[in-house]
């Protein structure tokens, strides 16, 4: 919801990166949880997108961008939300990326990651004759690592890929605990900003 973003706009607008700041929408960026008429919900969703663009962020809505570094480049792809509400289109986000390129996928909910493995991506998302490149690295959030962890037990521990680094068929997923949460409390589950260095 745009109202949840508003108090942090000034701070988030100060984020800068040499190759730009990229983002995707998560389930709370839509009006799925808002008790309002459809026109009000649509306006709120449009305002959230407008706010991210005004902050100078590259909001990836089932699309990709190319980041160049000298003679090398990587693709940064991003999907919309997978469920509640379901707007993700993996094929659209990856379409046009040729095999042999490194793909970094931004995806709020991590549960669909296994369907993007090299052995499954074209079966699940590809059209006949189409070759989609499996992302080598996917970054997700959504679970907040359960927000509460007691002796390693957390509410999300049985959810697929709820926290940490996972590997499958040479591709990796990292699900972060992030900074926010459903309620403003964390016990034994620290908020985090993760730095990943690509070499």
Model segments located where?
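Solvent-exposed loop/turn segments at secondary-structure junctions
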Residues: 1, 27-31, 65-67, 81-84, ...
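Membrane-embedded segments
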Residues: 1-58
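N-terminal post-signal-peptidase region of extra-cytosolic proteins
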Residues: 6-8, 61-62, 87-92, 152-160
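Conserved beta-sheet core of the metallophosphoesterase superfamily
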Residues: 13, 22-23, 111-195
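Conserved acidic residues
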Residues: 19, 101-103, 136
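Residues at the C-termini of beta-strands that transition into short coil/loop
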Residues: 25, 63, 80, 177, ...
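Binuclear metal-dependent hydrolase catalytic cores centered on His/Asp/Glu-rich metal-binding motifs
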Residues: 33-57, 61-64, 69-107, 111-114, ...
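Active-site beta-strand termini and strand-to-loop segments that position acidic
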Residues: 68-70, 168-169, 198
């Amino acid at each position: 919801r745009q109202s949840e973003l508003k108090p942090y706009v000034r701070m988030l607008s100060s984020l800068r990166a040499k190759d730009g700041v990229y983002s995707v929408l998560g389930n709370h960026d839509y009006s799925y949880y808002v008790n309002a008429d459809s026109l009000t919900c649509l306006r709120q969703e449009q305002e959230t997108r407008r706010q991210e663009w005004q902050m100078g962020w590259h909001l990836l809505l089932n699309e990709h961008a190319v980041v160049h570094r000298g003679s090398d480049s990587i693709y940064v792809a991003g999907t919309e939300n997978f469920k509640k509400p379901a707007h993700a289109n993996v094929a659209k986000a990856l379409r046009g990326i040729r095999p042999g390129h490194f793909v970094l996928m931004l995806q709020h909910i991590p549960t669909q990651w296994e369907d993007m493995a090299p052995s499954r991506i074209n079966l699940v998302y590809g059209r006949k004759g189409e070759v989609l490149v499996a992302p080598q690295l996917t970054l997700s959030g959504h679970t907040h690592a359960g927000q509460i962890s007691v002796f390693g037990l957390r509410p999300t521990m049985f959810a697929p890929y709820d926290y940490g680094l996972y590997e499958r068929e040479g591709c990796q997923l990292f699900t972060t605990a992030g900074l926010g949460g459903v309620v403003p409390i964390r016990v034994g589950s620290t908020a985090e900003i993760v730095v990943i260095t690509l070499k």
